[in-house]
Amino acid sequence: MSTLEQWLQVACAELGIDPASVDLRAVLDLTRDVARGVDRPAAPVTAYLLGVAVGRGLAPADGIARLTGLAGSWAAQHPAGEQPGA
């Protein structure tokens, strides 16, 4: 078991979450896309926002799809090095 998988088990136990309910690959893909297409610090913030939305009833897959799409459109509208509002 990798360190990430071990951490997932421990963190889920701490929060009372079934580890099987976490689509780890999808979350990692989302954070990768946000880090590359938006900004690195936006990745963990986006993961947190996804968690808040899921806690409020949004289906995880729907949230991931919406945020991945948003990150893709952001990257297309804001070429590398271009700062919005600058």
Predicted feature residues:
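A structural signal for alpha-helix termini and helix-coil/disorder junctions
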Residues: I17, R40, S73-Q77
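Generic helix-packing signal
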Residues: L15, A35, G55-G57, L67, ...
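Predominant activation on well-ordered alpha-helical scaffold segments within soluble catalytic domains
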Residues: E5, Q9, R32, T46-V52, ...
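C-terminal binding/interaction regions
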Residues: Q9-C12, A61-A86
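Amphipathic, hydrophobic secondary-structure cores in small proteins
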Residues: P19-G57
